[in-house]
Structures are given as C-alpha cells and as structure tokens.
C-alpha cells in the first residue's frame, strides 16, 4: 500500500466500513492485484495487449487515435470501480494486494478518482 493510502485510513476512515473508488474515465480502470513483484504489471500489460490489439481494421471508433478503442475495451473488462472493506480503521486487503490505476492509453492524461468512505 502507498503511504497516502495508509495515511488516509489512519486519519479519515471509520473503524468499520467501505472505501468505494470510482475512476471518471473510459480508457482507464481500477484493479486490485499483486503489488510485491513489478513483473505482474508487465505481464498484465502484455496479456491485455495480446488479447486486445491496437490498429485492428474493424475498429470504427478511431478519431481519438489508434490506441483509444482498445483502451475502452480493456477498461470495460477491468472496470471503473472498487469496493474495499475497512476493518479497525484500515483497508482490509491481503498482504500482497495493491490498488492499480490501469492506464490503457499510450499517452494518458490526468485521471480523476472519486473516493467515498462509508461506515461508522
């Protein structure tokens, strides 16, 4: 977990509840995956690039660049939101789990994430 994630849990979170994260974009996604080995990120990118290729002749949505339609498809598969339990004031995640912002454009812009904390 990042230092910011830990600080957020210590300072702002309820003892029990949920953290809901929502990314406000259609060519990026949020995911939870292993964060101990950076090869996981590399492998995940390779897998998605193999499954959903750029520059396919059947894409009709091409005005925003050849990487845009594949980015939409990848984001649809992964999803735009996460819900993480909060237990004893901390994110209740596995020891190897981390939150990923999955950028699927080759040159993605700034991304905005809405974080909603619910609980008591």
Q: Which stretches of residues belong to each language-model region?
A:
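Single conserved hydrophobic/aromatic residue that forms the stacking wall/gate
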Residues: 1-10
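Short, charge-patterned binding micro-sites
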Residues: 20-31
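Short beta-strand segments
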Residues: 22-24, 87, 102, 116
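Glycine-rich loop at the start of a catalytic domain that most often binds anionic cofactors/ligands
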Residues: 29-41
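Mid-chain, well-packed structural core segment of small domains
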Residues: 42, 48-94
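C-terminal binding/interaction regions
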Residues: 94-103, 108-120
